[in-house]
Regions:
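Hydrophobic faces of well-ordered beta-strands that scaffold small-molecule active sites
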Residues: 22-24, 58-60, 86-90, 117-121, ...
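A short, acidic, amphipathic alpha-helical segment used as a generic capping/interface helix at domain edges
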Residues: 158-185
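Hydrophobic pocket-lining residues that define ligand/cofactor binding sites across diverse proteins
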Residues: 14, 51, 170, 174, ...
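Active-site acidic/histidine proton-transfer and metal-coordination neighborhood
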Residues: 1-90, 202-207
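Short, acidic/polar
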Residues: 2-12, 100-109, 163
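C-terminal helical cap(s) of enzyme catalytic domains, especially alpha/beta-barrels
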Residues: 204-220
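Acidic/histidine-rich catalytic cores of soluble enzymes
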Residues: 45-155, 160
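Short active-site-adjacent structural elements
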Residues: 127-130, 201-205
Length: 220
């Protein structure tokens, strides 16, 4: 109830400021999926009518250790509302959690389809591969992924994410132009793609312009 009240206030502030898009995460606990799933839908029963009335777009992102981590399941939740006011955020650095280590970015983006309104670009290693990351105490490395999660947000090319596949699929989906058309599938204006690099601020003067140049080259 407190979270729903906070969200109502967030929506009010967004409307007052003229902000057309809010993005958020599913949150919750992967060890209590049924409870979290029920509470999410209960909350949306109250919030979605307000979101639609105000004409804003709310975008949902699955994050490692959320109650829903898999890309297709997260997309199904967004799709189930059949609302032009809800979108899906795809974070490239979470992709190995989204499909349990396969890294099939083409499938994941295509599955999202018209729900996809926001893409975050950053690289990471495949956490399902042996010794890509080493966590202590050692027994954590052999337990279920619900016990801990680890990933990175490094520059494109520094990890194992298939960015060629991401950009190729986004072009095939006409991601850059889809929301500019009269029959746009969602409200809230243009689709969004941005860089989500963390951890190395001393490299940003070089890496940020390089990322912008690549986005422009690949999509515009």
């Amino acid at each position: 109830q407190h979270a729903v009240a906070n969200w109502k206030r967030i929506i009010e502030i967004a409307v007052d400021m003229g902000v057309p898009v809010i993005n958020t995460e599913f949150s919750g606990d992967p060890n209590q999926q049924e409870i979290c799933n029920g509470m999410f839908f209960k909350s949306m029963e109250e919030l979605l009518p307000i979101i639609e009335r105000e004409g804003i777009r709310v975008e949902c992102q699955s994050h490692p250790y959320d109650f829903v981590e898999l890309n297709d399941e997260a997309c199904d939740i967004v799709k189930s509302f059949r609302s032009k006011n809800l979108g899906y955020v795809y974070s490239a650095s979470h992709g190995f959690f989204y499909d349990q280590g396969k890294g099939d970015v083409r499938h994941m983006l295509k599955y999202a389809g018209d729900e996809l309104t926001h893409v975050l670009l950053a690289d990471t290693w495949n956490q399902t591969k042996d010794c890509r990351y080493i966590v202590n105490p050692p027994w954590l490395n052999q337990r279920g992924r619900a016990d801990y999660t680890i990933h990175q947000h490094t520059a494109m090319g520094e990890g194992e994410v298939d960015f060629d596949g991401i950009f190729e699929t986004l072009r095939d989906m006409d991601f850059a132009n889809k929301q500019l058309k009269p029959d746009a599938p969602k409200v809230g204006g243009d689709n969004i793609i941005c860089v989500s690099y963390f951890g190395f601020p001393e490299k940003m003067d070089q890496q940020a312009p390089e990322a912008l140049d690549r986005i422009k080259h690949e999509l515009l």
